[in-house]
Amino acid sequence: GKLDKNEINTFINLLIEARDQDRQIFIMGNGGSAATASHYCCDFNKGASYGYDKRFKFICLNDNVAGMMAYANDVSYDDVFVEQLKNFYQNGDIVIGISGSGNSKNVINAVEYAKSQGCKVIGITIGLTGFDGGKLRQMAKYSVNMNIDDMQISEDLHMMLDHLSMKVITNNMISETLAKAE
């Protein structure tokens, strides 16, 4: 597989834009992708925000286990993310779906909802996928596809993208701070 540098640069620039415009960034996944989504939330809300005036507003939709299980039990597991988005999504927010296969129904449903709420025009949907990207890659306005036919390596690459993005953004913020001080 090959990583597309333009997809990665676009991803990083969209995160910076969301931070600068005080937008929320919703992120979600299942299984290993859920752990990755939670890790992104931690890294950006603390690691790329603490001590800076401009702060990220990541919200991990798979971290509220009680809420997810209530929707899974009473509505459908396919709707555990979309129902949470209905409470919080605002035009201009970013929705990041992480799915190794690109075909996780509950992630797809959340991205479809975001697009139906104007995300296609104003907001952004980003799909982090593996293999051929599945349905998520086709429907997301932006995607970063880890084109490799191995779930664990795909998940590892999603985590590497987290750390790479965070380091690029924090290094830029340090450079900006130093330039202002001169």
State what each model feature region is:
Residues 1-21:
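A short, well-structured juxtamembrane/interface segment
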Residues 17-89:
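Glycine-rich, small/polar surface segments that engage phosphate groups of diverse ligands
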Residues 24-28, 91-102:
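A short, small-residue-rich loop immediately preceding and capping a beta-strand
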Residues 33-38, 103-110:
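Short glycine/serine/threonine-rich phosphate/pyrophosphate-binding segments
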Residues 87-88, 151-182:
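A charged, well-structured terminal subsegment
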Residues 123-140:
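Short, glycine/polar-rich helix-capping loops at beta-to-alpha or helix-loop-helix junctions
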